[in-house]
Every structure is written in C-alpha cells, then in structure tokens.
From Swiss-Prot:
Gene source species: Cronobacter sakazakii (strain ATCC BAA-894)
Statement: the UniProt record of this protein carries the keyword Nuclease: no
Name listed for the protein in its UniProt record: 3-octaprenyl-4-hydroxybenzoate carboxy-lyase
Primary location recorded for the protein, binned into one broad class: membrane
UniProt similarity note: Belongs to the UbiD family.
Length: 494
C-alpha cells in the first residue's frame, strides 16, 4: 500500500470508507474526545473535524483507531501481514549473511527493502510553506484538544519529537505529550529512559548551560509516526525504518533555526529549544491507565519558529481507559513483536499483550517447554530483551497447548498447573511506569512472573495430571448424526 504523505494516506482511507469528514462545528474542549471515543469503541473510521470551534485548522483523530488502519500505515493490507514487518526487524536487529546461493535469493527481498533506508534531503519542503517566528509564534492558533474535564490544559498528543545527542550522528524520534502553558511554551513530558531525555542529559553534560535544540513534527506521514513507536534496532534510525515500511526513502529538510532534520511533508513543525534548568509542573492528565496521573516537573520547550503547510491539518488523539488509540496501536504492534522475540527465543509460540492490561503491563507467553525451569528463563528473557517490556508488571508463561489470546484457556492453565508458592516469581525494586500509582515509590516497583506450564521432573515430586481427550471415533460418529439429532434448531452447538 503506497502513499507519500499524510494527505495521500487520508485519500486512501477515504476511498475505502475509513475516513469520515465532520462538517458540524465541534469543540476541541472535550467534545472531540467524546465523539472520537464513541467512534473508536464501535470500530469506526478516522475522523477529520473540518470545523473546530474557534479555529480554521481541521483536526484529525482516530487515525490509528483500528488494527487495519495501523497495518495500512505500515504499508500492509491487514494486521496478519505485520508478522512480516516483525521478521524484517528481527533480521535487521541480528542480520545473518546468506548461507549459499539459494539462501541469498531467499533474502533478496529483505536486501531490496534496505535500499529504501537512507533519507532523501530536500532544500525546500511543504512543511515550510508558511513560517511564523519570534513574537509571531502563537500556539493558540492550533486547535489543541483538551480531552478530559480535569486535565490541566490543552495537550499535544501526537507530537513527533526530534532530538540529537552531542555524540550521536543519527537523530532520535519519539512521541512525548506536551502541555500548553503559553503562546510559545510547552512542557516536554519525557521519561528519563526515553531517547529524547537521554539526548538532553548527554547535551547538558557536554554543553553545560547551553540551549538544547528540539523540533516537533505534527502530522507526519503514518510510516514515520509508527517508526517512532516501533521497537527498531538501536543501529537503525526511525526515518530509515519508515522508508522500509513505505517502500520509498523518507524525505527530510533541515530546520530553519537548527540543524535537526524534520519530515518534509509534516503538516506543522515546532522549532525551538530547551533551556537547561527551566522546568514546570506537568499535569494532571487523564491517561491510558484510565486515571489522572500525578503532577511532576518536566523541561519546558520554548518554540521560536512554527512552520506549516498551506491548509495544514492538526493530528491529535486522546488517551483513556482501554480501548483507546494507543491500545489499538498496541494490538497491531503485538504482531510485530512476536517474530522479534522468536528470533531470540525460538521456543516461544505466541506472545500477547492484552489491551485491557494497558497494552504493556501484562504479557502472556506460550512456549514449547523443553526442560525444568524453562518457563522462568523465558519470563526473565521477556523482561530483559526489549526495553518496551521494561514496565511489564506481569508475565504469564503457558505451554503451547494454551491459546495465549483466550482468557478461558489462560485462566484454566493458571488454576490447574500452578502452585502459588512454587510457581510465582517476584522481582522487587525494578523500573516501573511513572504513571503507575500502584507502585510504592514513583518509578520503582515489583514484577510478578507466573509459571502456568505443566511441571517436569525436578519441578514436582507428584505424578502430573493427564488431560482429558475425547475418543476421535466417537466424535466422528456423533458428527455424522448431529444434524439429525436436531438438538439446536438453529444449528447452534454443532
């Protein structure tokens, strides 16, 4: 599925009935959230609010409101094809040279995709068609949504933040929410382990007291946005990965006020800096947990330039108790994660992050168990392999006869194959999501692993239970006469 920028993608969505234009006046204050939430829960289309109250700039919501649209953004037709994206990432994370001529041909598609990795630098770009700078900058021109009644202020949610550390050649792209606190001021809420925060820390050490350049792209093409939330290898830039997804090189242009490179087709770009030591209290905000988060101090982003396309579109979303857009995104990205994990742990059959678990706080793993203690090795591997699982509080490991995505199966395994004392692993004083108020200390808490596998010799001294299995001959005989029995007139139960 080929597209060049966000507008191309919206045209594709509209052709397929996946985009709804809203012409009635709708307020960015609470009303857009209510409409977007109802639409997402019904599996509805992306929404383009063409007449936001008090503004002339349209607002795009629910862009990734179904797994299908996430897959389309990654250049695929449906969610099942995302396993191939995961296989490509697994290959790039640990590339293997071809083992002979036939293997070379098998790997040719992957090598061809790599040709789309380098960025294409432009001198002039659509994102700089209109420019405001200095006193002309007024972020109130943008219809920034306020999503929940007790939110502190309007909040930018889909800002693609571009940074570069002082000792790094490649840039970091990350999605960090930003609270509006003035006509040219935002609070940059990034956690200390995230790429942007690490770049800032390194900058402050290398250039004490100097301003840290930052750019925020709003309304980038979907491949670039998704590249920023996908577990790409550290050696691969998000722009390069976006080129792989899109099938064409990512076009970038240099900022007007600094040397950062931004997506050339972005709808809006905010350029500016963070002054070391300038902090402000952020929040509270309703978040993907379903609760308002605590207030905490984060750096202030001062905007010196706003550039945009003609007739720019503002891309936004809301976060709340699942299902919300991040939860849907998590369902789709789950398919990308499976091949990456299987590359490192071939015994893993499936891996599932239930959306009701905030998309990352609980994981279910099914595996082909091969020895006593194997399940514990896998759960430790899940916690340590990808930083995306740093905040996963619960890991449930089951055998491969269990469907990881069926709670009936998983709960049966937990209640019949686990002894709580023997099969529960507790790990204390580990990194925990700052938004997790259940932990005793902010950012530090415990994790639990549940070994719900059948136990092997060495793990139990008792004879293990034998699962009940039907007689296949009897099943076949009853299948043959089932309709004749007419127990269910509507065919139910067959």
């Amino acid at each position: 599925m080929k597209y060049h920028d966000l507008r191309d993608f919206l045209a594709l969505l509209e052709q397929q009935g996946e985009l709804k234009r809203i012409t009635l006046p709708v307020d960015p204050y609470l009303e857009m959230t209510e409409i977007a939430d109802r639409t997402l829960r019904a599996g509805g289309p992306a929404l383009l609010f063409e007449n936001p109250k008090g503004h002339t700039m349209p607002v795009l919501c629910n862009l990734f409101g179904t797994p299908k649209r996430v897959a389309m953004g990654m250049g695929q037709e449906d969610i099942s094809a995302l396993r191939e994206v995961g296989k490509l990432l697994a290959f790039l994370k640990e590339p293997e040279p071809p083992r002979g001529f036939r293997d070379l041909f098998d790997k040719l598609p992957q090598f061809k995709q790599v040709l789309n990795m380098p960025t294409k630098r432009l001198r002039n770009a659509p994102c700089q068609e209109k420019v405001w700078q200095g006193d002309e900058v007024d972020l109130n021109r943008i219809p920034i949504m306020q999503c929940w009644p007790d939110d502190a202020a309007p909040l930018i949610t889909w800002g693609l933040t571009v940074t570069r550390g002082p000792h790094k050649e490649r840039q970091n792209l990350g999605i960090y929410r930003q609270q509006l606190i003035g006509k040219n001021k935002l609070i940059m809420r990034w956690l200390s382990h995230r790429g942007g925060a690490l770049d800032f820390q390194e900058w402050c050490q290398a250039h004490p007291g100097e301003r840290f350049p930052v750019a925020v792209a709003l309304g980038a093409d979907p491949a670039t946005i998704l590249g920023a939330v996908t577990p790409v290898p550290d050696t691969l830039s998000e722009y390069a990965f976006a080129g792989l997804l899109r099938g064409t090189k990512t076009e970038v242009v240099k900022c007007l006020s600094n040397d950062l490179e931004i997506p050339a087709s972005a709808e809006i770009v905010l350029e500016g800096y963070i002054e070391p030591g300038e902090m402000a209290p952020e929040g509270p905000y309703g978040d993907h947990t379903g609760y308002y988060n605590e207030i905490d101090n984060f750096p202030v982003f001062t905007v010196t330039h706003v550039t945009q396309r003609e007739n720019a579109i503002y891309h936004s979303t809301y976060t709340g108790r699942p299902p919300d857009e991040p939860a849907v995104l998590g369902v789709a990205l789950n398919e990308v994660l499976v091949p990456i994990l299987q590359k490192q742990f071939p015994e893993i059959v499936d891996f599932y992050l239930p959306p009701e678990g905030c998309s990352y706080r609980l994981a279910v793993v099914t595996m082909r168990k091969q020895y006593a203690g194997h399940a514990k090795r896998v759960m430790m591997g899940v916690w340590s392999f990808l930083r995306q699982f740093m905040y996963t509080k619960f890991v449930i490991v089951c055998d491969d006869d269990i469907n990881a995505r069926d709670w009936n199966d998983v709960i049966w395994a937990i209640t019949t194959r686990m002894d709580p004392a023997r099969d529960t692993v507790m790990v204390e004083n580990t990194p925990i999501d700052y938004l997790d108020f259940a932990s005793p200390v902010s950012g530090l808490g415990s994790k639990m692993g549940l070994d719900a596998t059948n136990k092997w010799p060495g793990e139990t001294q008792r004879e293990w239970g034998t699962p009940i299995k039907k007689d296949p001959n009897v099943t076949a005989r009853i299948d043959a006469i089932w309709d004749e029995l007419a127990i269910f007139h509507d065919g139910k139960g067959a």
